[in-house]
Amino acid sequence: LDRLTWHLSRFQGFAGIANFMGGRFVVTDAVMQPIIREAAKRGLGYLDDGSAPRSVASSLAAAQAMPFARADLSIDAVPTAVEIDRALAKLETLAKERGTAVGIASALPISIERIAVWAKALESHGIMLVPLTTAMLKSKSG
């Protein structure tokens, strides 16, 4: 927790924190509780990367009344143009069905390229790309 507090004190302008490759970590209430509490105290949201089906982050975030979102899918789990495009199409379907959908991706050049192409066509598909904080607040209220 000391490391988290130190890192959080060094940056400005971010809206929240997220787990990364912490599947075992996010399923343990006693481990996650102080992290969620510290983030909530600072007015931050939490993005669960969706890697752990038994993650306790959602319930802990709800208990703190903090903004929260869970990634619906990893867009570049298979980092090829075809698979990224397929994942983005699935993300669109989820967004149309539920009103919002959250995808995560790494900063691979192919991921950035495919997301940029996809984002340009969203309006013609009846979808609006919004900041993650919008999805977090929608999740918190709904």
Identify the residue ranges that each predicted region occupies.
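C-terminal accessory segments enriched in acidic
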Residues: 91-92, 96-99
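Short, flexible loop segments at boundaries between secondary-structure elements
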Residues: 129-142
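Catalytic domains of cell-wall/extracellular-matrix polysaccharide-remodeling enzymes
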Residues: 2-88, 100-101, 106-127, 133
